[in-house]
Amino acid sequence: MNRHEQRLKLMIAIYQYLLLHKDINEVAEDIKSDNEVINEYFYDVLATIYDHEEELIEKIDICLNDWDYDRLGYIEQAILLLGSVEILKMKYDKAIVIDEAVQLAKEYCDDETYKLINGVLDKL
């Protein structure tokens, strides 16, 4: 599974976590039960989001300007959490993370949402 596919699985896992209020370990097991190979990166990202969720949301909220994190859809929240944890906590290359997040937004969100995702992650 390449990194884009891993990020897609993570977006789905984070979405389930946010929407269904499931335990993060239960979400990981649900994804794993789909016969997918889940690697250390997957677990590291989920654990880091779980451990720093409030801090990440605060930083996202600051970058949203006239918007509020809670008003965003769960998919948008999931993409922003994924991107923010990779940029702020895991120190991945910001340009690559933003590009991947924009791709996910173009595939799974409303037409113009990718611009919001791009702008927020760029400000982090």
Where on the chain are the PLM-derived regions?
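N-terminal interaction/assembly modules
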Residues: M1-L124
